[in-house]
Amino acid sequence: MHLTDYLTRLPKADLHCHLIGTVRAGTFADLARRAGLDLPAPPETIWRDINSLPPDPALYRHTRIPVPSGAGTDEPEVSYSLFRASEWVMAALGGADDITRITYEAFEDAHRSATRHVELHIDDVPPQLASLGFHGLVDACVDGIKLAERDFGMTGRLIASIDRSRDAEEALAFVRKVADRPNDYLAGIGLVNLELAGPPERFADAYRLAGAAGLRRTAHSSEHAPVAENTRTCLDLLGCDRIDHGYYVLEDDALVARCRDEGVPFTVISTTSRRSWRPWRRASIGAMAAAGLNVILASDDPGMFPTSLAGEYRIAAETIGLSAARLREMSLAGIEAAWLPPAEKAAARARFAREIAALDAEFPPG
C-alpha cells in the first residue's frame, strides 16, 4: 500500500472545522441563486478565487519563523476573502432545511477522508433566520449529524462560536443563550474571527459562565496576533481545554515547554485562505511537532480553501516531513482530545485502534 493510501484510510477526528467553511461551491451556487444574492462573480468563480489578504506585514517583522510579506505563487487575479465568502453563505441560508443540508454534506465530505468524528464550529443565527433562533439552528445541525451517524457511522458535536469582534456583554449574552438550553450535541464554545479584532481577556466572563455550565472551551489563539501571550491567557484566564491554531506560541520557549509538559492539544491546519502564508504555516506546524507539542491536524474551512483532512495528513507527510508513525499518534491524539462523553470516547478509541491495526497489517509501520 502506498503512503498516500495509508493516510487517506487512517481514521481521523476533525476537531476544528467551521460549518460555514465546509459549504461546497455547488451548494453555495444553489443557495445563492435561490436567495437572489447580488454577487460580484459566479459562485463557482468566487470559491475558486478565495484568497484572504494578510494583515499589515510590519506586525510580523520580528517573528522567529519569517512570515511572507509578498504575494503567493498561486494568487488569483481577483481575490475574495474567506470572511466575505462566509457572509454570503450566511445571507443565502433560507431555513432549517438548508442548515441540515450543509451539516450533512460536511460529514459526507469528511467521511471521504476516513474522518470518524467531527466537531463543527457554528455561528449565531443570521438575521433572516431570527424566527428560527439559535436553538432552532442547533436542532437543524443535529438533524444533519444524526443523518450522518446513520449513513456513515460517524459521530459529531457542535461548538458555539463567539465572534471576537463583538463586545464582552454580547459574548456573555450569547453564552447565556447557549447554556439556557443544554443539548448533548452542543459540547462547548469557541472564540473565532480575526484575532486582532478582540483580545481573549475581553471574554473572560463569557468563558467563566461556560465553564460553570459544564461547557468545554477552546479559542483561536496566536494565529493572527504574533504573540504567545494570547495562548497563555486562553489557558489561564479562559480555562481552555484546547487551542485552535497557536502557531505563535513558538515565540515563547517557556510556554512551549509548559504546553508540551501539559499535553495541551493544538488543532492546526497547514492550508489557509491566506495563500501566501501557507509555507509559513507548514514551517510552524513542523516546528511545533519538533518541539513535542500535541499538534492535531484539522481542516478548518475545507470547502473554501479548499482542502480535506486526508489532504492535510498528506501535506504533513510530504511537505512538512512528518512520519507515518507521528501521524498515527496524531490520529489517536485527536480522539483523546475530542469532546465526547467517556463511553463514546472509549468506543471511538477502540475503533481507531482496530482500524489502525488493520492498516498496519497491510502497510508496515514507518
Where are each of the predicted segments found?
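Metal-cofactor-binding active-site regions of metalloenzymes
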Residues: M1-L215, E223-R242, Y248-G366
